[in-house]
Amino acid sequence: MAVYLLAVAILFCIQGWPSGTVQGEVMPFMEVYDRSACQTREMLVPILKEYPNEVSHLFKPSCVPVLRCGGCCSDESLTCTATGKRSVGREVMRVDPHKGTSKIEVMQFKEHTACECRPRSPGDVNDGRNPKEGEPRARFPFV
C-alpha cells in the first residue's frame, strides 16, 4: 500500500493534479475571459453582515455559501449588478453564549439568480482624487 501511495504522489508531481491544472500552467485566454465575466458565483457571506442585529449570538459556521453576482464588465463605467434575486434557506447553529445553549435553525439569505453589467450610479465612480464620505484622505500600509 505504501508503494502505491508513493507512486501516486510521484505521478502527481510529474503530471499535476487530476483537475487538469498543472502548477505553473498558463490558463488559456478564453477560459480566463469566461471565468472573469459578470455572472453568479458561489461566495461565502458572513452571517453578521446579513444579520447585523444578531451580534449577541455566535453562528456556526460564521459564513454561508450563496450565489452572488461578481466579475468584470467590459467598461469601467459599468458594474456587475444582480437582476434577479430569491430567498434561500441555510441551516446554521445559533449559539447563545450567555445562556450556554445552541440550536440548529434555518436562516434566510438573498441569493442572486441573474446578473448583467449596468451603468454605475454617480456615487459609485471615484476617480481616486477625492475620498468618498467617511473614507480616510490617505491610506498608508504602515499605519
Swiss-Prot record:
Keywords: Disulfide bond, Growth factor, Pyrrolidone carboxylic acid, Secreted, Signal, Toxin. InterPro entries: Cystine-knot_cytokine (IPR029034), PD_growth_factor_CS (IPR023581), PDGF/VEGF_dom (IPR000072), PDGF/VEGF_growth_factor (IPR050507). Residues 1-24 form the signal peptide. Expressed by the venom gland. It comes from the Eukaryota. It is found in: Secreted. Pfam families: PDGF (PF00341). One of its GO terms (biological process) is positive regulation of endothelial cell proliferation. One of its GO terms (cellular component) is membrane. GO terms for molecular function: chemoattractant activity; growth factor activity; toxin activity; vascular endothelial growth factor receptor binding. Its main location: secreted. The keyword Protein biosynthesis does not apply. Residues 117-143 are annotated as: Disordered. The keyword Lipoprotein does not apply. The modification Pyrrolidone carboxylic acid (Glu) is found at residue 25. Disulfide bonds join 38-80, 69-115, 73-117. Snake venom VEGFs may contribute to venom dispersion and prey subjugation by inducing vascular permeability and hypotension. This protein activates the vascular endothelial growth factor receptor-1 (VEGFR-1/FLT1), and consequently promotes the proliferation and tissue factor production of endothelial cells, the neovascularization in the chicken chorioallantoic membrane, and increases vascular permeability. Also stimulates tissue-factor production and human monocyte chemotaxis. Belongs to the PDGF/VEGF growth factor family. Snake venom VEGF subfamily. Homodimer; disulfide-linked. Interacts with VEGF receptor-1 (FLT1) with a high affinity, whereas it binds to VEGF receptor-2 (KDR) with a low affinity. Does not bind to VEGFR-3/FLT4 and neuropilin-1 (NRP1). This is Snake venom vascular endothelial growth factor toxin.
